[in-house]
Amino acid sequence: MINIGLSGSTGKMGRAIAERIDEFENCKISAKFSSTNSLYDLDNFCKHSDVFIDFSTPEILETLVNYALKHNTKLVIGTTGLQPKHFKLLEKAAQTLPILYSANMSIGANLLSYLAKEAIKILDDYDVEILDIHHRNKKDSPSGTAIMLAETIANGKDLDIIFNRGNRPRKKEEIGISSLRGGNVHSIHEISFLDDNEIITLKHEALNNNSFANGAIKAAIWLQDKPSALYSMQDIYKIY
């Protein structure tokens, strides 16, 4: 039996994971951490968990990582809005622990990332724009997924990622991200490749949180026999 701790248990993703855990054999929720708990509770929670899934806030990450290192608890990190210091923390901890980080745990979004990486090889002279749409209550903008997609496309192309152009025209050597927040939209990401004659658009839309929850649980199971390293969902789905 795999004991899975859950950080951010009262949020949308935490609830979705708890609701779907019974669909996976030999898995159970061993601990639930939320904003009502003390950070010190993470010590005991990590002690009794084989792996911790984190969908909380960036402020909790350092404490969670420290207790995970203390108890050799594997980590699946889905919290977005992380800063460079957080990624450095994960990279260092991954020398000791198997850790999987992804801004989006669904197979669809990761397939979109792969398709975009392949498309830019052919459409390398096209303008690239990303549209990121989420519900009105999402805090980070642009989304972690939008940044992941932009970084995938920009990798090796020497392209700047732009969130706000202000009053200037578009430059050729950039990828623009536009964010919309409103209603109860779960998640929509569109990547458009544009030239003077045509527009090619790749799109992923999540209709609910189930695909993210399924991906997170699969990641927790997948990590069990893996050596220490920092992994992504593309390692699970084998789409590079």
Curated annotation (Swiss-Prot):
Location in or out of the cell: Cytoplasm
Location of the active site: 134, 138
Cited Pfam families: DapB_C, DapB_N
MF terms (GO), sorted A to Z: 4-hydroxy-tetrahydrodipicolinate reductase; NAD binding; NADP binding; oxidoreductase activity, acting on CH or CH2 groups, NAD or NADP as acceptor
Signal peptide coordinates: none
PANTHER family for the chain: 4-HYDROXY-TETRAHYDRODIPICOLINATE REDUCTASE 1, CHLOROPLASTIC-RELATED, DIHYDRODIPICOLINATE REDUCTASE
Name used for this protein in its record: 4-hydroxy-tetrahydrodipicolinate reductase
Gene source species: Rickettsia canadensis (strain McKiel)
Taxonomic lineage of the native organism: Bacteria, Pseudomonadati, Pseudomonadota, Alphaproteobacteria, Rickettsiales
